[in-house]
């Protein structure tokens, strides 16, 4: 009787990094993926036709990888795009991994065994299910870092032990950079280009709603996944992002729940600008 290869049974991860003129930040991201001791990794770099040294960093990365003891697949595409979420949708379409994680330039996987930790959590959940179904989502925690890569501490919002689509009524409790989506589901639910700043919030909810409808597991890896740069698109456009998130919450949770939750947010954070 032929036995399956245990290595082949492990999930393959696509780490997708969207870049544009990111030479000052991308090396930190590259090195964190390069350091992973897990072999089934595709690092997909979708570049928006950068004019700085971003691609030079990628080419050096590819050269180092060709000589590495643990080689990962590195794929780079550089062409003009229509913005961040258009590039992220390209990454979804190009991904060959079973799970996809978006890691922006300047963000980093927390430790060399991060992907191994997530893979073990996925396999444990799969083998404990009756039909050995692959989880819809795996998630974990994040730590904030500054531009120098120094850890500032955890995010204000923390991931729950058990995550469902309803959890996001309380805000984006799981950072996008710590949310591994089953790639098949990601292709069913591309980022909605109507949202300029918060399409990731909507995307995560839609994938988790699918998981609930089809009884697919959502797995807590119970580890820190990423060091998250505390200066992203949402941070730079905070007010516009909040308005989009309000619309997204109304879409998924209805007016009553959304208004009630925003009243709670205002009472908890009276000095926080909305």
Language model regions located:
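N-proximal low-complexity "stem/linker" segments adjacent to membrane-targeting elements
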Residues: 1-35
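Cell-envelope/extracellular polymer assembly enzymes that use nucleotide-activated donors
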Residues: 11-14, 42, 202
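A conserved acidic beta->alpha catalytic loop
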Residues: 39, 47-56
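Acidic donor-binding/catalytic loop of UDP-sugar-dependent glycosyltransferases
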Residues: 53, 86, 107-125
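Glycine-rich, basic loop-to-helix element that forms the pyrophosphate-binding segment
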Residues: 77-95
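Short aromatic/hydrophobic "clamp" motif used to bind/position activated sugar donors
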Residues: 100
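Short beta-strand-to-loop element that shapes/binds the nucleotide-sugar donor at the catalytic cleft/hinge
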Residues: 138-150
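Conserved nucleotide-sugar donor-binding catalytic segment
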Residues: 140, 154-240
């Amino acid at each position: 009787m032929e036995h399956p290869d245990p290595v082949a049974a492990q999930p393959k991860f696509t780490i997708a990094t969207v870049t544009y003129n990111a030479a000052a930040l991308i090396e930190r991201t590259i090195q964190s993926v390069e350091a992973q001791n897990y072999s089934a990794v595709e690092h997909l770099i979708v570049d928006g036709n950068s004019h700085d040294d971003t691609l030079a960093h990628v080419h050096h990365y590819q050269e180092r990888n060709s000589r590495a003891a643990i080689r990962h697949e590195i794929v780079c595409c550089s062409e003009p795009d229509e913005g961040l979420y258009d590039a992220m949708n390209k990454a979804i379409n190009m991904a060959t991994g079973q799970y996809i994680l978006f890691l922006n330039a300047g963000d980093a996987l927390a430790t060399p065994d991060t992907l191994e930790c997530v893979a073990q959590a996925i396999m444990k959940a799969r083998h404990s299910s009756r039909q050995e179904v692959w989880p819809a989502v795996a998630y974990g925690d994040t730590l904030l870092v500054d531009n120098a890569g120094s850890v500032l501490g955890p995010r204000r919002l923390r991931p729950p032990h058990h995550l469902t689509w309803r959890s996001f009524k309380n805000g984006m409790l799981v950072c996008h950079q710590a949310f591994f989506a089953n790639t098949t589901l990601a292709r069913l639910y591309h980022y909605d280009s109507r949202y300029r700043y918060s399409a990731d919030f909507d995307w995560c909810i839609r994938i988790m709603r699918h998981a609930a409808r089809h009884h697919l597991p959502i797995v807590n890896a119970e580890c820190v996944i990423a060091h998250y740069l505390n200066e992203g698109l949402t941070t730079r456009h905070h007010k516009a992002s909040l308005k989009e998130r309000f619309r997204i919450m109304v879409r998924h949770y209805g007016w009553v729940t959304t208004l009630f939750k925003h009243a709670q947010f205002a009472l908890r954070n009276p000095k926080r600008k909305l």
